[in-house]
């Protein structure tokens, strides 16, 4: 499952892993113990939420958030016993406090400050351990297009930039997650949860032997342990299985992060920053499993979904044209259920602009229902799974729509039944 030990190890620490002075101390202990070649860090837990709120507020009402963010980071620095200058970041926020309209380019600069701050604190504290650690600026490595708030990495540019870096083998490089830059140096961000994506891109660039994701749970569970009790740790998943979980609501990993690891065949290990047993879940290309029949490995719940249906106005309409139209408007279809006369697909309910309806009317009659919940059952060889067991477990709970493939069964249900249905199915399948 692992590459040669001489290949680089990439470690990524999420927001809860760097949320307090105590947790940052733990992060530095792990870095000292594991000696990864590259470390990618998220913003301090909750700070990106504050920065998003900063961007939403009108001018004249943002100063309180600047002070809140300042107090949080200066308090952490004081508790860590380090002296570090963060003044440049407060100057940026203060500059934008009274700007009338924050454009997407401005918002990207603001949102990136969370990772700029956390990486500065962690780098400074790690140096007290006398570690051979240097800062690697994400804006020089994660090169993207100019979609400032949902930037798409340009792998060709990144590979060129990577080859020009004078990296030293005996040095640990610490980099901000979530953010990057255009070829002209303007700051971009990869979207919420994008630090996972940053780490996987680094894993691809350096041909890592392993990407280790440190979070607040010890791996991937049979359901979200923050929603259900008595969930079980999953030892291993394939990339395909994890992709299904991530795209249907599992928050443990960002769904875009898997593609670089698939391309470069970099295995992922998800574990907890705070669990000394070092339990976790391996995610890799294939597993040495001998299951003969279908098996359910995990459930995921995604709330606040919109179910769209396009009834084709011509037999010449193609599925890829409909989905391409949706993507061209900046939306990512979730579950897609194609029929001969039309197609169902889901997107987040908040993303319900009239522009989608108008654009899709070129292909046929358009309808939308929501908000709804999506419950996904993920596993292997599920195309032959008998749905009777699922419907028996749900009793009289109405299922509005469902689909079944070899790796996932998707159920679209009323939004009020999401947690209850997930719990019912989990009890039925795993107890």
UniProtKB/Swiss-Prot annotation:
Classification via CDD domains: AAK_AK-HSDH-like
Annotated keywords: Amino-acid biosynthesis, ATP-binding, Diaminopimelate biosynthesis, Kinase, Lysine biosynthesis, Nucleotide-binding, Transferase
Gene: lysC
Pathway(s) where this gene product acts: Amino-acid biosynthesis; L-lysine biosynthesis via DAP pathway; (S)-tetrahydrodipicolinate from L-aspartate: step 1/4; Amino-acid biosynthesis; L-methionine biosynthesis via de novo pathway; L-homoserine from L-aspartate: step 1/3; Amino-acid biosynthesis; L-threonine biosynthesis; L-threonine from L-aspartate: step 1/5
GO cellular component terms, A-Z: cytosol
Similarity field: Belongs to the aspartokinase family.
Xref: InterPro entries: AceGlu_kinase-like_sf, Asp/Glu/Uridylate_kinase, Asp_kinase, AsparK_Bifunc_asparK/hSer_DH, Aspartate_kinase_CS
Reaction equation(s) it catalyzes: L-aspartate + ATP = 4-phospho-L-aspartate + ADP
Keyword Cell membrane part of the UniProt annotation: no
GO MF, one annotated term: aspartate kinase activity
EC id: 2.7.2.4
Transmembrane segments: none
Gene Ontology biological-process entries: diaminopimelate biosynthetic process; homoserine biosynthetic process; lysine biosynthetic process via diaminopimelate; threonine biosynthetic process
Protein name: Aspartokinase
């Amino acid at each position: 499952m692992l590459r040669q030990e001489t290949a680089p190890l990439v470690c990524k620490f999420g927001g809860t892993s760097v949320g307090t002075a105590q947790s940052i101390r733990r992060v530095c202990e792990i870095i000292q113990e594991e000696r990864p070649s590259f470390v990618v860090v998220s913003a301090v837990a909750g700070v990106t939420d504050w920065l998003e709120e900063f961007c939403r507020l009108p001018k004249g009402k943002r100063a309180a958030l600047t002070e809140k963010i300042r107090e949080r980071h200066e308090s952490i620095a004081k508790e860590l016993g380090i002296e570090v200058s963060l003044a440049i970041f407060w100057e940026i926020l203060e500059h934008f406090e009274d700007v009338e309209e924050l454009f997407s380019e401005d918002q990207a600069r603001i949102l990136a400050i969370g990772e700029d701050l956390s990486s500065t604190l962690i780098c400074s504290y790690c140096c007290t351990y006398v570690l051979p650690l240097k800062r690697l600026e994400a804006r020089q490595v994660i090169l993207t297009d100019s979609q400032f708030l949902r930037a798409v990495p340009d792998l060709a540019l990144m590979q060129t930039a990577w080859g020009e870096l004078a990296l030293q083998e005996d040095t640990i490089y610490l980099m901000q997650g979530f953010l990057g830059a255009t070829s002209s140096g303007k700051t971009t961000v990869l979207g919420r949860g994008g630090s996972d994506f940053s780490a996987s891109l680094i894993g691809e660039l350096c041909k890592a032997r392993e990407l280790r994701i440190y979070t607040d749970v010890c791996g991937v569970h049979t359901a979200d342990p923050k929603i259900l009790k008595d969930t079980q740790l999953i030892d291993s998943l394939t990339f395909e299985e994890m992709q299904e979980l991530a795209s249907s609501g599992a928050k443990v990993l960002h769904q875009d992060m898997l593609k670089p690891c698939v391309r470069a065949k970099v295995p992922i290990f998800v574990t907890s920053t705070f669990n000394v047993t070092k339990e976790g879940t391996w995610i890799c290309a294939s597993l040495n499993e001998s299951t003969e029949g279908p098996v359910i490995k995990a459930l995921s719940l995604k709330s606040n979904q919109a179910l769209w249906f396009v009834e084709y106005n011509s037999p010449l309409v193609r599925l890829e044209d409909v989905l391409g139209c949706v993507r061209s408007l900046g939306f990512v279809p979730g579950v897609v259920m194609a029929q001969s006369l039309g197609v169902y697909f889901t997107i987040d309910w908040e993303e319900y602009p009239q522009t989608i309806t108008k654009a899709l009317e070129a292909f046929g009659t358009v309808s939308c229902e929501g908000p709804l919940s999506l419950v996904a059952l993920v596993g292997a060889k599920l195309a032959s799974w008998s749905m009777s067991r699922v419907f028996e477990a749900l009793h009289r709970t109405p299922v509005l729509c469902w689909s079944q493939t070899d790796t996932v069964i998707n159920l679209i249900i009323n939004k009020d039944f999401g947690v209850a249905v997930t719990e019912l199915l989990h009890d039925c399948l795993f107890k």
